[in-house]
From Swiss-Prot:
One example GO MF annotation: neuropeptide receptor binding
GO BP of this protein: blood vessel diameter maintenance; negative regulation of gene expression; neuropeptide signaling pathway; positive regulation of gene expression; positive regulation of phosphatidylinositol 3-kinase/protein kinase B signal transduction
Family: Belongs to the neurotensin family.
Keyword Transmembrane: no
SUBUNIT field: Interacts with NTSR1. Interacts with SORT1. Interacts with SORL1.
First and last residue of the signal peptide: 1-23
Organism: Canis lupus familiaris
Record's keyword terms, sorted: Cleavage on pair of basic residues, Cytoplasmic vesicle, Secreted, Signal, Vasoactive
Subcellular location(s) per record: Secreted; Cytoplasmic vesicle, Secretory vesicle
The protein's name in its UniProt record: Neurotensin/neuromedin N
């Protein structure tokens, strides 16, 4: 009886080690994919003048994936446990749905990575800065008082003769 338990224990240990090695390979692939994506983003971040189409596509894909998650959570008819089990185990397990689920999971991991979120904030700042400049120009084009126009522009240092003028009156 002891020999049978030892064989089962050895089989369990071998199974655990093999599954850990498979998981580490997929994690390494995900880290390599994420690193490649982030290096491409970092090198392209240097030219902030225009946002390339693949970056905007990636932002759109991430927002789409987040919308899918939020729609599934907004149904509210199911408890969270049922929703999680439905998400993990679809009704028809064919090769296409498994591959699609894996792709969506990888996209979620990339979109939720901290470095990508920081890059996304930088890109939003660049886009918002472009919009702010256009809004300032529109405000300036309207007829507004001179003082308000002066406040919109960056403050210039005061001229020295204005500061020295007070000493002449003493």
């Amino acid at each position: 009886m002891m020999a049978g338990m030892k064989i089962q224990l050895v089989c369990m240990i071998l199974l655990a080690f093999s599954s850990w090695s498979l998981c580490s390979d997929s994690e390494e692939e995900m880290k390599a994919l994420e690193a490649d994506l982030l290096t491409n983003m970092h090198t392209s971040k240097i030219s902030k003048a225009s946002v390339s189409s693949w970056k905007m596509t990636l932002l759109n894909v991430c927002s789409f994936v987040n919308n899918l998650n939020s729609q599934a959570e907004e149904t509210g008819e199911f408890r969270e446990e049922e929703l999680i089990t439905r998400r993990k185990f679809p009704t028809a397990l064919d090769g296409f749905s498994l591959e699609a689920m894996l792709t969506i999971y990888q996209l979620q991991k990339i979109c939720h990575s901290r470095a990508f979120q920081q890059w996304e904030l930088i890109q939003e700042d660049v886009l918002d800065a472009g919009n702010d400049k256009n809004e300032k120009e529109e405000v300036i084009k309207r007829k507004i008082p001179y003082i308000l126009k002066r406040q919109l522009y960056e403050n210039k240092p005061r001229r020295p003769y204005i500061l020295k003028r007070g000493s002449y009156y003493y």
